Amino acid sequence: CETVISGKKVLLLKPSTFMNLSGQSVTEAAAFYKVPMDRVVVLFDDISLEPGASRVRRKGTDGGHNGIKNIIYLSGHDDFPRVKIGVGKKPHPDYDLADWVLSGFKKEEVEPMKNAFILAQGAVEQIVAGNIDKAMNLYNGTGRQKAQEKRAARENKAPAAPHPSQPAENAAQENPGESKA
């Protein structure tokens, strides 16, 4: 599907190959459209992140993800941006990984996953606009936010604004005339 993101024409692909063979689709499309790998953005599931968490990376290893491993192997590059979307760990070590990542989400995971897709969209918009550092700062977990809050407390300043993935803790107090509904 061709579309425009951040004012740039982009092509969105969902490989129809098995996930472990994602590199076939990605490298063929990149070659056909003459897109260098550092301009290819890959979104994928990550079992090392909690459901709904996201992480942006400029480049890196496959991290044990066979689809990413195949993209790196067939393209010969690991320097493509990626957005990881957490799906959580298997409930038991004996649970089949393919069954786990293809299963549905628990009721309590649905809202965090919806939020993850919104965050992934924002991250992709920043990456396409050429702002991968900004995407990483905005969308990579809460570690940075907690560090900012600790630093602010030491300096006796107000804490930084909440991370985009975190709900405003005092929304009702900040907007007393508005309800959550």
What is the meaning of each model-derived region?
Residues 93-111:
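Short, electropositive alpha-helical surface patch
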Residues 112-116:
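Short amphipathic alpha-helical coupling segments at ligand-binding clamshell hinges
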Residues 1-59, 69-84, 90-96, 117-118, ...:
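Nucleotide and nucleotide-moiety/phosphate-recognizing core
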Residues 64-67:
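Hydrophobic alpha-helical segments within soluble ligand-binding/sensing domains
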Residues 179-180:
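N-terminal, polar/charged subdomain of small-to-medium soluble alpha/beta proteins
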